Amino acid sequence: MSVVLELSDTNYSSFMEQTESIVFIDFYSPTCGPCQTLLTFLSILQEHYQDEDVIIAKVNVVKNPKLAQKFMVQSVPLSVVVGKDKMVKRAEVGLLSIDRYIKMIDKALGKGGFFAKLFG
């Protein structure tokens, strides 16, 4: 199983310039209970998408305030899906079910039927 990527103020820009993948980013705080639960979900998402063009990443907002500011993080956990075009496709605040995170990523991948694309 691959390791979840740790993005930071210093490596974010160069990483995003180089990647051509969809990126799921979890903005978290080490003292946030729901954030700790979501961090355990990241390994599940990593395994689920290991054969897809998706990178699972996390950002500690305490250690990386510039990156948190760039994404206008006001509450954690914040989950963001960045498309291959480098644009934010979806952002959700709070702890969601693992199925909801999968739907967020699948939508960015173009998966799902007509109704999933409309209402997903």
Predicted segments, located by residue:
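N-terminal "domain-start" segment that seeds a small globular fold
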Residues: 1-15
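N-terminal targeting signals for export/organelle localization
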Residues: 1-2, 48, 110-120
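Short active-site neighborhood of thiol/selenol oxidoreductases, capturing the structured segment around
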Residues: 18-30
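Hydrophobic beta-strand anchors of alpha/beta hydrolase catalytic cores
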Residues: 24-25, 56, 79
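The canonical Cys-X-X-Cys-His
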Residues: 32-35, 79
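Typically the conserved alpha-helix immediately C-terminal to a functionally engaged Cys/Sec
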Residues: 34-48
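Structural microenvironment flanking redox-active thiols in thiol-disulfide oxidoreductases
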Residues: 61-68
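Non-catalytic, surface beta->alpha helical segment in thiol-disulfide oxidoreductase systems
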Residues: 75, 80-117
